[in-house]
Amino acid sequence: MKRTIVTLAVVFMALTVSAQEWAPVGDNIKTSWAESLDPSAPLPEYPRPQMVRSAWMNLNGLWNYAVTEASSESFVPEGKILVPFALESSLSGVGRRFTRDNALWYEREFTVPRSWKGKNVILHFGAVDWMAEVYVNNVLIGEHKGGYDPFSFDVTPALKKSGKQTLKVKVQDATDNSFQPRGKQCIINAGIWYTPVTGIWQTVWMEPVSSAYVKNYYAVSDIDKGEIAFEVDARTADGDVVK
């Protein structure tokens, strides 16, 4: 009974801390989903329903953040941001504008489950607008350009054998001051132009895989023949791509 009471107390304290560190910004009209948002577990749904693996970890939630000069290679956290909501949005808890002269930094810690030992760990981003540099334990894992497509990295080589791991993401977004695809986003939004979307705006998550695994698949149907052809994108133990 004592153990149960202590556990419930810890959970309650964690939820209280989350509520104190985050609140929607501004007086924007909210949907029922926004009204009931839990900052300790935003968007908890499995992010890839067409190819489900039972083991995975959702990294959404409160991260440290800072806005620095674009050329900066380091940062000092200035507050909390709720991932996966864009910097400019109310639900991020920040509601701040961004320019091409800025860099947006994210930081959080995570622990790899013991049950993942011997597996490769894949880090997934549903979308980050626009250019992202990803670091694990201060090791640059990879870069991605594009605000609308998902991307992933095998972070296994950068992981420590045990204990807390550190994940950092540096984002730059020029919006309409560059060539990048942006829809109707505009830094000076008025009329038909929308407020920009900067930073992580889709689920961040990890999963363990074997050294050889299926990364993706594509299905093409032939109605006349009554057939479906599958193209499988796989990775071998040697790192080769097989299709």
Identify the role of each PLM range.
Residues 10-18:
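Hydrophobic h-region of N-terminal signal peptides that target proteins for export
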Residues 72-75, 180, 241-243:
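Beta-strand acidic-aromatic groove motif in beta-rich domains, primarily in extracellular
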Residues 20-56:
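N-terminal pre-domain segments of enzymes
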Residues 2-8:
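Sec-dependent signal peptide recognition
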Residues 64-68, 96-97, 101-216, 237:
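Accessory beta-strand-rich segments of carbohydrate-active enzymes
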Residues 61-84:
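Predominantly extracellular/luminal regions of secreted and cell-surface proteins
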Residues 136, 226-243:
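Beta-strand-rich binding/interaction modules
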Residues 220-226:
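Short, solvent-exposed loop/linker segments at the N-terminal edge
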